[in-house]
Amino acid sequence: MKLGSRHNQHSFAQIPSVHTTRSKFNRSFGTKDTFKFDDLTPIFIDEILPGDTINMNTKTFIRLATQVVPVMDRMMLDFYFFFVPCRLVWDNWEKFNGAQDNPSDSTDYLIPTITAPAGGFENMSIYDHFGIPTQVANLEINALPFRAYNLIYNDWFRDQNLIGKIAVPKGDGPDNHADYQLLKAAKPHDYFTSALPWPQKGMAVEMPIGNSAPITYVPNAGNGPYPHFNWVQTPGGPGNNGALSQVTFGGQKAISAAGNDPIGYDPQGTLIADLSSATAATINQLRQAMMMQSLLELDARGGTRYVEILKSHFNVISLDFRLQRPEYLSGGTIDLQQNPVPQTSSSTTDSPQGNLAAFSTASEFGNKIGFSKSFVEHGYVLGFIRARGQVTYQQGLHKMWSRQTRWDFFWPKFQELGEQAILNKEIYAQGNATDSEIFGYQERYGEYRFRPSEIKGQFRSNFAESLDVWHLAEYFTVKPSLNKTFIESNTPIERSLVVTRPDYPDLIGDFWFDYTHVRPMVTYGVPATFGRF
């Protein structure tokens, strides 16, 4: 009798494989939106199914509001695309899909929601940019994409040294609509924006000098002109000055010696620590302290998100999905191209022939901004745009002008010392004592490696008749501090635009997403016949 091999025998430990039909869909679409400089504005949102494969290229045409003049500065548009699994923004996502820790656990869950307030979601709000109808009161919507927005901001656009985490609810909801609003990304790093608020992450490591030292008495009180002790015989009466030998307690004198010698106390102290006999730190303890300080300095410079620790300490790049964080898919940057418009039909003296105005546009119709990606779990793909200008400063004094001693200059022997201070006058000179206070910390001799752009002459914003409409340099009305206000992108675009109303958009955009989607579903949703017809 011939027996079958164990490979073709039935196994109760297995289930049959699922052969899911996958179909290709052209889901290309367009969107038109208005937005402001510096805001991290959503332009794309789509839900993802396990087994999806997408290929997308972004085509865009963007126009800046009419300018007073053609600005002599670079203006850029950054695009970002991320994937956020549902399980990262809802703790009970797996249970919602049927998972149980115990056989009797409930799987009766509903997607967390947000309810619109009275008056509905506002125009130009984050809800508007996600495509939610505005001005509709009590509208109930899925909260997970908004949680994903906040999570992406925390992990990718927030300066962890200066800005605290924003709320990312992960419970069953409902969420408060006020928890979600348009956020601003941190400025690109330069000499000032990459400054640290401290020279190391955490407390500075102290030098080990041992545990104890003997105390020695120094008899230096002497017989100086110290005052006698005073005491009062009658409450509220005058004090009596006298020798301590005249004071009695129960008939006994306070001291037995006769005379009027006073008792004195030396305010300079009579005890010293004899460090010649102190216990000493070992060389290994000194090495350990130095290496610990070096590690904390690297933590400060490299960052302490786990992915940053792996890169800065081990030179290992861990994939985003392995660290349970939003996965960066793709991005790109395009420039706004400025077009001067000369006055050719002057009819007033304040707009002579040849007077310049300007308009700016940006376009991308190639494959520069896009990606291809296959997915293995439920989630959302989110796309963002951010408009920004090149950051320039105009009120600081370069460190070169403040060098006085030999040690203020570069020396090769000193280039591996710790972080050096950036003084306030380097970014905002005032000519007073605050100039020498610390703004932040930068790598040793960083000013030799970075050359800032400059603003001079009538371009300076403090000029009585300034021409600062021609550029986008920062101008501080008060001394800046290294904090959230400073680090968030804040391009002064309004001074270069004709219309400066806060409710008026800086840019208008037309976006076309060339979007091919392969999904685990049949091409057409034909009702099943169950083999009967």
UniProtKB/Swiss-Prot annotation:
GO MF, any single term: structural molecule activity
GO CC terms of this entry: host cell cytoplasm; T=1 icosahedral viral capsid
Region described as Disordered: spans on this chain: 333-353
InterPro entries, A to Z: Capsid/spike_ssDNA_virus, Microviridae_protein_F, Microviridae_protein_F_sf
Presence of keyword ATP-binding: no
This protein's record includes keyword Magnesium: no
Intracellular or extracellular location(s): Virion; Host cytoplasm
Keyword annotations from UniProtKB, A to Z: Capsid protein, Host cytoplasm, T=1 icosahedral capsid protein, Virion
General function of this protein: Assembles to form an icosahedral capsid with a T=1 symmetry.
Family: Belongs to the microviridae F protein family.
Designated name of the protein: Capsid protein VP1
Lineage start: Viruses, Monodnaviria, Sangervirae, Phixviricota, Malgrandaviricetes
